[in-house]
């Protein structure tokens, strides 16, 4: 089955294995295991030629690459690197990190088929202040559209409904025609992620 979306933008609610880190995420939103994420029928949403833009933290990179394959895409590159500034000061934000004090997050780019980029002048860096916990810069959507063109697009795990985007997530009214409920009610429990 081929879907209609040529652009899929996702910020998965990663579940961390470290209890200290996991608690921080769980205080703000429900998280999902890698198997729960892999069970989502995202591959069915993707057009024959489509691009996936997916946020991942550095500790989650191995799981992010597994998820890309499970959703039917092939990893290509890091589309964007978000360098975080503090909200109220012109200085860099630093999280606790695992080995070093963390700052950046990456948005991975993966493809299915042969999507065409529409612009060659889109810069990888996004320098933007942090906002609500885990909220990504709105500028990312603009960069995606500039890079890929005004194509049918959906944002998964969305927190808002931006113009021109279909959305799905537990913080928005879904417009993507995916599932009527949050994944814990609609995922397939017998699916495991590819290694």
What is the role of each PLM region?
Residues 1-195:
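Class I S-adenosyl-L-methionine-dependent methyltransferase catalytic core
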